[in-house]
UniProtKB/Swiss-Prot annotation:
NCBIfam families linked to this entry: aroA
Designated name of the protein: 3-phosphoshikimate 1-carboxyvinyltransferase
Coiled coil ranges: none
Residues given in the record as 3-phosphoshikimate binding sites: 22-23, 27, 167, 169, 315, 342
Species this protein is from: Legionella pneumophila subsp. pneumophila (strain Philadelphia 1 / ATCC 33152 / DSM 7513)
Keywords assigned: Amino-acid biosynthesis, Aromatic amino acid biosynthesis, Cytoplasm, Transferase
GO CC annotation: cytoplasm
């Protein structure tokens, strides 16, 4: 078992980049694989989750070179060129891989099966199997959870689906199926979710309409190979945005971070708490906005986080809770029940961990209350969740004594270079088995 020890430090200073965006990396493989022609992807995240997606397409006959220095070259086989995999597709820890692949595989002429690790096998899949079934797909789960068994050769029909809650994975799953369905597939969102799939469709020249909160797609298009530069992942940058905000005297610059407006909840929330974050040198990598982020220490104050921020910061809440633990006053969050359905129950994991470190935190069914103060040293269990592990590693920098974090191997799913990058900013994080 891989564990971390994170020791208290003085100020954090320096300039870093973070690995490529995980959401965009997954999608670059998917669309590159079903495109006509070759795609060259730079900035690809070679973490375990995205490699699971890459290997899935290799098992379906797609030739993919790399990753080599974050470059991947995909020799697309077109929409109808995928071949039946010889084995069950193992998605590892990656819910994105499983849910997006399910939408694509539901439209193929061959049978397939998707499985994953112990954590993934506990995650809800009815949210995709039900609408896929409405489209005519034959998709079965084990009591609503993986593994997923898909019978191919089914004729899909477009549907109008109103999203019951914000979920980029469900939306993307249905858009991928809609690329093969007869008639229009229309997806209406009542709350904004990540729009990387819609942007990626445009990048690969596939026609998609976006109007009045709805996304419309049909089968009368093709993806075409392209060149793509992936920005740094704001979900990875989040750890250092918070770290610089809560560590006195800190001054940190993070270059080339994706600032897609469906992902910048962390900047809005921390700014409302009093953080000193400047967004510099705004530009675009293709369809995706990018900037450099300059963060300096500032005393934070507790706030009531609006529920409207939940889909815009869903993956960043664990480290936002660390910021709340260092703020003056109380921070509350409601409307975030989805946090209990991630790689771990993130509300439960953070409440337990914060209490272990002397911070008063209470969990609700859909949120949390945190009383800011000081973080003590101690030991926490990440529950095998990469974002919990990294969040408590950040806490160690400002704790009164070292923080030991157990069960950290899954950090490799999203940020394999986390410890190296952190220590460039003068963190003192050590790994041990």
């Amino acid at each position: 078992m891989l564990n971390f020890i994170s020791k208290p430090v003085g100020c954090l200073k320096g300039e870093i980049t973070v690995p490529g965006d995980k959401s965009i990396s997954h999608r670059s493989i998917i669309f590159g694989a079903i495109a006509i022609g070759t795609s060259v992807i730079d900035g690809f995240l070679d973490g375990e989750d995205c490699i699971a997606t890459l290997k899935a397409f290799q098992s379906m006959g797609v030739r993919i070179e790399g990753p080599d220095k974050q470059r991947v070259i995909i020799h697309g086989v077109g929409k109808y060129g995928l071949k039946q995999p010889q084995n069950i597709i193992d998605c590892g820890n990656s819910g994105t891989s499983m849910r997006l692949l399910a939408g694509l595989l539901a439209a193929q002429q061959f049978d397939s099966q998707l499985t994953g690790d112990e954590s993934l096998l506990k995650r809800p899949m009815l949210r995709i199997s039900r609408p896929l079934s409405q489209m005519g797909a034959d998709v079965t789960t084990q009591d609503g959870k993986p593994p997923i068994v898909i019978k191919g050769g089914k004729k899909l029909n477009g549907i109008h689906y109103v999203m019951p809650e914000a979920s980029a994975q469900v939306k993307s799953c249905l858009l991928l199926a809609g690329m093969y369905a007869e008639g229009q597939t229309k997806i209406t969102e009542n709350a904004v979710s990540r729009d990387h799939t819609e942007r990626m469709l445009r990048t690969f020249s596939y026609p998609v309409q976006i109007q009045d909160g709805a996304i419309i797609i049909d089968c009368n298009g093709e993806c075409h190979g392209t060149r793509l530069n992936i920005p740094g992942d704001i979900s990875s940058a989040a750890f250092f945005i918070v770290a610089a905000s809560i560590t006195p005297g800190s001054d940190v610059l993070i270059r080339n971070v994706g600032i897609n407006p469906t992902r910048t909840g962390i900047i809005h929330i921390l700014t409302e708490m009093g953080a000193d974050i400047r967004v510099l040198n705004q530009r675009a990598y293709g369809e995706e906005p990018v900037a450099d982020l300059h963060i300096r220490y500032s005393q934070l104050k507790g706030i009531d986080i609006p529920a409207s921020m939940v889909p815009l910061a869903i993956d960043e809440f664990p480290v936002i809770f660390i910021a709340a633990a260092c703020a003056q006053g109380k921070t509350t969050l409601h409307g975030a029940k989805e946090l209990r359905l991630k790689e771990s129950d993130r509300i439960g994991a953070m409440v337990d961990g914060l209490n272990q470190l002397g911070v008063h935190a209470e969990g609700f069914d859909d949120g949390i209350l945190i009383e800011g103060g000081s973080i003590q040293g101690g030991e926490v269990n990440s529950r095998g969740d990469h974002r919990i592990a990294m969040s408590f590693a950040i806490a160690g920098a400002v704790a009164s004594a070292p923080v030991t974090i157990k069960n950290c191997a899954n950090v490799a799913t999203s940020f394999p270079s986390f410890v190296t990058t952190a220590n460039m900013l003068h963190f003192q994080i050590e790994e041990y088995s």
